From Swiss-Prot:
<dbReference type="Pfam" id="PF12796">
    <property type="entry name" value="Ank_2"/>
</dbReference>
<keyword id="KW-0040">ANK repeat</keyword>
<comment type="similarity">
    <text>Belongs to the ANKRD39 family.</text>
</comment>
<dbReference type="Pfam" id="PF13637">
    <property type="entry name" value="Ank_4"/>
</dbReference>
<keyword id="KW-0597">Phosphoprotein</keyword>
<feature type="repeat" description="ANK 3">
    <location>
        <begin position="96"/>
        <end position="125"/>
    </location>
</feature>
<dbReference type="InterPro" id="IPR002110">
    <property type="entry name" value="Ankyrin_rpt"/>
</dbReference>
<keyword id="KW-0677">Repeat</keyword>
<protein>
    <recommendedName>
        <fullName>Ankyrin repeat domain-containing protein 39</fullName>
    </recommendedName>
</protein>
<dbReference type="InterPro" id="IPR036770">
    <property type="entry name" value="Ankyrin_rpt-contain_sf"/>
</dbReference>
<feature type="repeat" description="ANK 4">
    <location>
        <begin position="129"/>
        <end position="158"/>
    </location>
</feature>
<feature type="repeat" description="ANK 1">
    <location>
        <begin position="30"/>
        <end position="59"/>
    </location>
</feature>
<feature type="modified residue" description="Phosphoserine">
    <location>
        <position position="153"/>
    </location>
</feature>
<feature type="repeat" description="ANK 2">
    <location>
        <begin position="63"/>
        <end position="92"/>
    </location>
</feature>
Length: 183
């Protein structure tokens, strides 16, 4: 535990420098109070409360991530479903071009990927590295998601990233997915 620093009036907990290493930036405080933290933590009640207070479900944080990106990455299905039903843009992109489908695919959340696709998410969207959601799923060896994405868009197999790699080129060694992703 951090030790309080003495102030002119003695030990003082409320002084900004009272506790070493326990300071938050305004940006961090905005994140904690905003919809992003609630989505990240799967706090559906808080997400609903913030949406009812007219918070935009597609409002990005300072890094360009929306609540749907955070909920998708962390596997919070109910939060994703509520955000989509509340008008969240399923193909909103971060500063690096990632969509919620990229995040769900990379993290192995098949049911969330299915939910996003059912709400119109485009699996052919590429991030700044030229990677599709199929590249992201293949990179981590998520076979169920690879199959799901190919059902929606078989042409994904032929898309190369900026380094000219196909999704099958990113498979982990000894992957059973090579046959699925190779033409």
């Amino acid at each position: 535990m951090a030790t309080p620093r003495p102030c002119a009036d003695g030990p003082c907990c409320s002084h900004p420098s009272a506790v070493l290493g326990v300071q938050q930036t305004l940006e961090e405080m905005d994140f904690e109070r905003g919809i992003w933290s609630a989505a990240l933590n799967g706090d559906l009640g808080r997400v609903k409360h913030l949406i009812q207070k007219a918070e935009d479900p597609s409002q990005p944080d300072s890094a360009g991530y929306t609540a749907l990106h955070y909920a998708s990455r962390n596997g919070h299905y109910a939060v994703c479903q509520f955000l989509l039903e509340s008008g969240a843009k399923c193909d909103a992109q971060t500063h690096g071009g990632a969509t919620a489908l990229h995040r769900a695919s990379y993290c192995g959340h098949t049911e969330i990927a299915r939910l996003l696709l059912s709400h119109g998410s485009n699996p052919r969207v590429v991030d700044d590295d030229g990677m599709t959601s199929l590249h992201k799923a293949a990179e981590r060896g998520h076979g169920d998601i690879c199959s799901l994405l190919l059902q929606h868009s078989p042409a994904l197999k032929a898309i190369r990233d900026r380094k000219a790699r196909l999704a099958c080129d990113l498979l982990p060694c000894n992957s059973d997915l090579r046959d699925l992703l190779s033409s």
